[in-house]
UniProtKB/Swiss-Prot annotation:
Organism, as annotated: Christiangramia forsetii (strain DSM 17595 / CGMCC 1.15422 / KT0803)
Function: One of the primary rRNA binding proteins. Required for association of the 30S and 50S subunits to form the 70S ribosome, for tRNA binding and peptide bond formation. It has been suggested to have peptidyltransferase activity; this is somewhat controversial. Makes several contacts with the 16S rRNA in the 70S ribosome.
Biased composition (Basic residues): 245-264
UniProt GO MF annotations: rRNA binding; structural constituent of ribosome; transferase activity
Family: Belongs to the universal ribosomal protein uL2 family.
UniProt record, GO biological process: cytoplasmic translation
UniProt keyword terms in alphabetical order: Ribonucleoprotein, Ribosomal protein, RNA-binding, rRNA-binding
Protein name as it appears in the record: Large ribosomal subunit protein uL2
Region feature Disordered, mapped onto this chain: 223-279
Length: 279
């Protein structure tokens, strides 16, 4: 994978860094795995705005992704690596031996014509293979992890993300998540071998406001520029600092822990994620 820094022939391209898309093998998606997406503009079923700064954006079609990897024991061949406008990671089209086609999240290093398999039994821990945590060797880099058996992958799915299997004890496996959190999950949960593709996504620079509009992101108003009725940090004479950083609902921002101390799943967290150091 690579990135491209554009020549500064316009102000919008001066600082722009785009993906080289070297890993992409086709620009035509599988039509049978496409579904329509209706834009909401941040409004609910009553037409009321429930999420600010959303609206517009390029028209897209959803790619139906197989997060469960429940087609057990049937080998599949990687037909193509494709771009997905709905996520940061690339996706891979699999052709199963029984004729079915499915999309999965592509792992880093997954190649066209490579064979992958999903199995509840012990399988070869190669990139792209999916199996329960109980059958994965300790220390393996994994991604697309289930939180509950049969739920489908919910953790480590974005571009470049990966977790690591640290230990197994009884019916639980201990994994280190991308956030740094160390957590126990049931060993029956499925995971995929390898890190998620498109690890260079973090190097992308939009270069201009228009790219955010292409993505459906509208301009964000600074809280200190609002009135007191609209935000706790609004108001004041002239250019006020806004006081202590607060959210729109008045909760402290920048480092305040919002997770409930009595949440039932706290017992599965061995070590909480590290807070980022202020620069």
């Amino acid at each position: 994978m690579s990135v491209r820094k554009l020549k500064p022939i316009t102000p919008g391209q001066r600082f722009r860094v785009v993906n080289g898309y070297d890993a992409i093998t086709t620009d035509k998606p599988e039509k049978s795995l496409l579904a329509p997406i209706k834009k909401s503009g941040g409004r609910n079923s009553q037409g009321k705005m429930t999420m600010r700064y959303k609206g517009g954006g390029h028209k897209k079609r959803y790619r139906v992704i197989d997060f469960k990897r429940d087609k057990q024991g049937i080998p599949a061949t990687v037909a193509s690596i494709e771009y997905d406008p709905n996520r940061t990671a690339f996706i891979a089209l699999l052709n199963y031996q029984d004729g079915e086609k499915r999309y999965i999240i592509a792992q880093n290093g997954l190649q066209v014509d490579q064979n992958v398999v999903s199995s509840n039994e012990a399988a070869t821990p190669e990139i792209g293979n999916a199996m329960p945590l109980a059958n994965i060797p300790l220390g393996t880099v994994i991604s697309c992890i289930e939180l509950r058996p049969g739920q489908g992958a919910v953790m480590a799915r974005s571009a470049g993300a990966f977790a690591q299997l640290l230990a197994r004890e009884g019916k639980y496996a201990t994994i280190k998540l991308p956030s740094g959190e160390i957590r126990r999950v049931l060993a029956l949960c499925m995971a995929t071998i390898g890190a998620v593709s498109n690890s260079d996504h973090q190097l992308m620079i939009g270069g201009k406001a228009g790219r955010s509009r292409w993505l459906g992101i509208r301009p964000r108003t600074r809280p200190v520029a609002m009135n007191p009725v609209d935000h706790p940090m609004g108001g004041g004479e002239g250019r006020a600092s806004g006081g202590h950083p607060r959210s729109r609902k008045g909760l402290p921002a920048k480092g305040f822990k919002t997770r409930s101390r009595t949440k039932a799943s706290n017992k599965y967290i061995v070590e909480r994620r590290k807070t980022r150091k202020k620069k």
